[in-house]
């Protein structure tokens, strides 16, 4: 992933997407497939995760702290469902993206340079406010501000 997509994932789409969504976005925008498919665990929630060329997991792009599941036999049902969902994405990538408002919005904002610049400015302002001790302004502010920009 490039800087623009990471900026969007870290600001506007923070905690909104999952690893399958990141998989679909990378496959659609960058035409890249993962090197390896693994299963990760976060707070007793097991999900599919993807390792890319730079040894970064899809969950890392989302800022998730996860651990690798070593024994997939103990969670066979989850493994089967996750593989089935991934094959559905592979069979109809554009359909998967079109049915998701979040993914359509991500791609729309990714293609707008103005939205990326404003996200960068808002993020730097948020950092300055945090350094000044004002913690009340969070990611919701950024999401709302960029949402207004994307409507123009």
Swiss-Prot record:
Any Gene Ontology CC annotation: membrane
Entry's transmembrane regions: 22-38
Domain of life: Viruses
Name by which UniProt lists this protein: Late protein H7 homolog
Conditions for induction: Expressed in the late phase of the viral replicative cycle.
Compartments, record wording: Membrane
Family in the record: Belongs to the chordopoxvirinae H7 family.
Protein role: Contributes to the formation of crescents and immature virions (IV).
Membrane protein topology class: Single-pass membrane protein
Keywords tagged on the record: Membrane, Transmembrane, Transmembrane helix
Organism field: Fowlpox virus (strain NVSL) (FPV)
Pfam families attached to this UniProt entry: Pox_H7
Chief site of localization: membrane
């Amino acid at each position: 992933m490039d800087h623009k997509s990471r900026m969007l994932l870290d600001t506007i789409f923070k905690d909104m997407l999952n690893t399958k969504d990141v998989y679909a976005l990378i496959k659609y925008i960058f035409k890249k497939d993962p090197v390896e498919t693994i299963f990760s665990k976060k707070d007793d929630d097991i999900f599919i995760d993807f390792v890319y060329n730079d040894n970064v997991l899809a969950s890392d792009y989302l800022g998730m702290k996860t651990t690798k599941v070593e024994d997939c036999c103990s969670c066979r049902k989850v493994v089967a469902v996750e593989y089935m969902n991934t094959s559905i994405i592979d069979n109809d990538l554009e359909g998967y993206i079109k049915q998701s408002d979040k993914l359509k919005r991500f791609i729309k904002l990714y293609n707008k340079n103005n939205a990326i610049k404003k996200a960068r400015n808002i993020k730097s302002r948020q950092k300055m406010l945090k350094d000044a001790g004002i913690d009340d302004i969070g990611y919701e502010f950024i999401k709302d501000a960029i949402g207004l920009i994307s409507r123009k």
